[in-house]
């Protein structure tokens, strides 16, 4: 399973090849998009990218956790976390790719 990790440089290269911008312009475009997404998330806004996913910030209340080594109860402070929820379109594409790969390996 798994494969390679896609980096910013990979995204820049893909924009360069598919859109036809220069590498410098492609890098600037990728950075602008990522900055906009990050700024929105940091400001508590929901980012919904149709057919891809929704990024959302959630508040988690304080709760009691347990130290796994000692069993001692430890308070876990309230915090904000980001959630990623894949769209149904993306989930379906992942499932289809998985089924396609399963079909190749079972022959």
From Swiss-Prot:
GO terms for MF: DNA binding; structural constituent of chromatin
Gene Ontology CC annotations of this record: cytosol
Name of the protein this chain belongs to: Integration host factor subunit alpha
The UniProt record lists the keyword Chaperone: no
Family note: Belongs to the bacterial histone-like protein family.
Keyword Lyase tagged: no
HAMAP family: IHF_alpha (MF_00380)
Organism in which the protein naturally occurs: Brucella suis (strain ATCC 23445 / NCTC 10510)
Subunit structure: Heterodimer of an alpha and a beta chain.
InterPro entries for the chain: Hist_DNA-bd, Histone-like_DNA-bd_CS, IHF-like_DNA-bd_dom_sf, IHF_alpha
Gene behind the chain: ihfA
Functional description taken from the UniProt entry: This protein is one of the two subunits of integration host factor, a specific DNA-binding protein that functions in genetic recombination as well as in transcriptional and translational control.
Domain of life, per lineage: Bacteria
Record-linked NCBIfam families: himA, PRK00285.1
Keywords: DNA recombination, DNA-binding, Transcription, Transcription regulation, Translation regulation
One GO BP annotation of this record: regulation of DNA-templated transcription
Any coiled-coil regions, as ranges: none
Name of a matching Pfam family: Bac_DNA_binding
């Amino acid at each position: 399973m798994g494969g390679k990790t896609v980096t910013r440089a990979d995204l820049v290269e893909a924009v360069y090849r598919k859109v036809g911008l220069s590498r410098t312009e492609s890098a600037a475009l990728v950075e602008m998009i990522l900055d906009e997404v990050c700024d929105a998330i940091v400001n508590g806004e929901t980012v919904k990218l149709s057919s891809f996913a929704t990024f959302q910030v959630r508040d988690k209340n304080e709760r009691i956790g347990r130290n796994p080594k000692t069993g001692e109860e430890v308070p876990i402070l309230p915090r904000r976390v980001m959630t990623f929820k894949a769209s149904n379109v993306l989930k379906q594409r992942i499932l289809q790719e998985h089924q396609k790969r399963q079909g190749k390996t079972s022959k």
